Amino acid sequence: SFRAGVSVRNRFIYGDLVESFPSYNDLISRDYGYLHKLTRNLVEEDSYLVNTSVDRLWMHYTRGSFEVRIGRQRINWGQTYVWNPNDLFNAYSFFDFDYEEKPGSDAIRLMYYPSYTSAAELAVKVNRDEQVTAAGYYRMNKWGYDWQFLAGILNDEEYVAGMGWSGDIAGAGFSCEATYIRPDKNFRDTSGILLASASASYMFDNSLYLQMEGFYNGNYEHMRLGSFRSYYYRPMTVKTLS
């Protein structure tokens, strides 16, 4: 069977920020995907602008346990809630909460489901600079936990390998993700980067829900953040999550 999906976001932005921030128009219309022309400003004036962006544009084919999706889509391999080192394709800032729809990738995704609790995937995306991110992914359930393993290449520049799991300990939810990244150039002479997150959650009898999460980013010293703005507006990748 075939399916298709389209989702468009339209924004009218008005205020002093548009006028006082000279590069704000370019920032709003910036799209890092291969199909970057799907985002543009329809109207640009001194104090307001009108922006449109195609969030999703895909075709999907299903035959038995096999599925293929082509186009702008969300590829979510995360297990934890706030920071997702395993989410190679759609990294996003947790502080960017003004829009519930998460970013998509311009990609081809192959999916196979051997059983109800297992899945194998292969995904390839191309960004605006024609850099390729490609990875394989396998998920299974064992010992009461959901386990996942992945490996691939990030933006034609780095090898990646990772794993994650989610389950519970004494009734409390427990999830972890870890990804190791190493440059493909001078592979033997360079050190890699470890990204890891851990999350714990618990719901009490009175429905009070508590959740805690921590994150380690081995790339932090190389991010050179001078302010919160320099973090918030920089291109998001799995290495710039913190």
Where are these regions (language model features)?
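Transmembrane beta-strands of outer-membrane beta-barrel pores
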Residues: 8-14, 63-65, 72-76, 124-128, ...
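Transmembrane beta-strand segments that form the barrel wall of outer-membrane beta-barrel proteins
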Residues: 92-94, 114, 118-128, 134-138, ...
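Transmembrane beta-strands of outer-membrane beta-barrel proteins
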Residues: 2-8, 68, 119-122, 147-149, ...
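Outer membrane beta-barrel
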Residues: 2-118
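Residues that define the transmembrane beta-barrel architecture of outer-membrane proteins
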Residues: 50-55, 62, 102-106, 130-134, ...
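Outer-membrane beta-barrel strand-turn architecture
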Residues: 53, 62-65, 114-116, 140-144, ...
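Detector for outer-membrane/organellar transmembrane beta-barrel domains
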Residues: 166-242
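Residues on the lipid-exposed face of transmembrane beta-strands in outer-membrane beta-barrel proteins
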Residues: 1, 56-61, 108-112, 136-140, ...
